[in-house]
Amino acid sequence: MPLASPRQLFLLAFLACVAIMGGALYLEHVVGLEACPLCVVQRIFFILIGLTCLAGAIQGPGLRGRRIYSVLVFLLALGGGATAARQVWLQTVPLDQLPACLPSLDYMMQALPFQEVIRLVLHGTADCAQVSWTLFTLSIPEWSLLAFVAYLGFSIVQFLRRA
């Protein structure tokens, strides 16, 4: 007999996303850390994963629906993981080899075409390479990458599960 139903697991995954976003907002508004553009993209991926898991928890789909939700979570976690991995890589590059800092995301959205904003944000800057906070010697993007890997594992388990 399984320990938890797929519906309960989707709810648990949603609550984990809520906790992750709560932690991100705490670090931004209480601790005072400014989110770089890659951090904002990772937050968007966490929100989309959370909404997908919430939909799966509310609907309580059958096998086919659960697999569809699992594939969506997998793809979103893959995108978020790639973004987090890019930021982790940027943190290893010497500062003199990084591109200059970008203007705020709000300004870029108003002044530049959308495709250019996406290209600049995903390219990363010196802002994204700065390690301003760690927990157990892991930076925020490293924790984010671990969370995305956990969501990849979750989606695979949900996809392969029969009951």
UniProtKB/Swiss-Prot annotation:
The gene is dsbB1. It comes from Pseudomonas aeruginosa (strain ATCC 15692 / DSM 22644 / CIP 104116 / JCM 14847 / LMG 12228 / 1C / PRS 101 / PAO1). This is Disulfide bond formation protein B 1. Residues 1-9, 62-67, 162-163 are cytoplasmic. GO terms for cellular component: plasma membrane. It is found in: Cell inner membrane. It holds the Pfam family DsbB. Keywords: Cell inner membrane, Cell membrane, Chaperone, Disulfide bond, Electron transport, Membrane, Oxidoreductase, Redox-active center, Transmembrane, Transmembrane helix, Transport. PANTHER family: DISULFIDE BOND FORMATION PROTEIN B. Belongs to the DsbB family. The keyword Transmembrane applies. Its main location: membrane. Required for disulfide bond formation in some periplasmic proteins. Acts by oxidizing the DsbA protein. It comes from the Bacteria. The lineage of its organism: Bacteria, Pseudomonadati, Pseudomonadota, Gammaproteobacteria, Pseudomonadales. It is a multi-pass membrane protein. GO terms for molecular function: electron transfer activity; protein-disulfide reductase activity.
